[in-house]
Amino acid sequence: MARHTQDQTSVHWREGGKASRRTFLKSTVGAGSALASFSITRSGWNAKSRPRWQSHTVARIPEGYQVAVADVNGGGRLDVLALSSQKNIVDWYQNPMWHTRSVTTSTEDNISLAPLFRRGYPVQGMALASGFHLDHPEQGGDIWWAQPSASLDAEWSLTRIGRIPASHRLRWADLDGDGRVELVDVPIVGAGSRPPDYSVPAPIMWFQMPETLLTGHTASAGQQSNNWIPHLIDESLNIVHGVLVMDWNGDGRDEILTASTQGVNLFESKGRGAGLQWTKTLLSPCDQSSDRYHGASEIGVGKVQGHRFLATIEPWHGNKVVVYTRRTRGFSERHVIDTSFNNGHALVCADLDGDGNDEIVAGYRGPGTSLFIYHSTDERGTRWERETLDTDMAASCVVIADVNGDGRPDIVAVGSSTANVKWYENLGFA
């Protein structure tokens, strides 16, 4: 088993009183919402507390690229979904025995998946992006709506709902606060981009779901495809790699944060439906001094002592984990907390130990294949301690979810060269 160590002071923690209670505030978690929101209460926990972790193998998958969780079969447990970027594999694994079932084997060069399984929501299924070709983006970019079949063992029915070259990240978001979600599609580059600069900006889009799906009236595949209406959000950013959907400003609608060559940008909307109007705000330019690529490629948001911070991997597929804390003029205070990454590709923020402060979970795909947890050691989020979670995880994607239903946030990750899907069980206090 890969080692699990703390890179600095070794500490053990004990629970004061009975097990803490964590309650999901949202019933859907996926690659598009890497963190399920928890309401956490605890007593008797000190600032040096650390959860214990136990790794479990979910599956082997060649060149694993994206992972998500959702209650696919309605069994009350979060199942795991994953795809391979090299093989025509899009699978889901049924919790708790992790029986492998195929979503589809008919798509190639898969790149992103966004499950939609919300309790009480009128439609269930998954958005899937395939045909990814970074160096020749116009050769692909297919976007699919996949609906489960009546049999758990049957592949899902696919409807192509759009084609946007270099589609790279799919996310569900309630963009106008009406309780219905829209599909956000973020290409990494624009059509016509070529290496090494990839200079054509990416058209960030959102799709309105067909009314026929939302009302439960069955339509033909062709009608469904035509009714997924695309709308442009922005077309000014290059190499848009990281995407985070969250209610940034507490207005009851989801905002979009991106990590790109230009740094971290926030997109906020006003209006309703097809009339949405967008405002872009630069939160941080990030790394603009590297020789080849600039900006950031992953973005996470957390809080320490109630103060928000940004966490990034810099630059594109870079070697640095960076934290930005807020000063009078935005997130202008930069703290490089790790420079050891080799092809950094996974990052999420979450309160893993219930102390009210968020940790950072981040990993990389290159030699060393490691996944780490970073713990803040001061009240401002300027100093961090690294804990090694796994050295057998070439982390391409990581999400946080309560996998076993014990109320604790667990970690789920997929590895590329390590060809694995794992979940890391939060065992609580020793």
Describe these PLM feature segments.
Residues 1-19:
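N-terminal secretory signal peptides
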Residues 13, 17-23, 28-430:
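Beta-propeller-forming repeat regions
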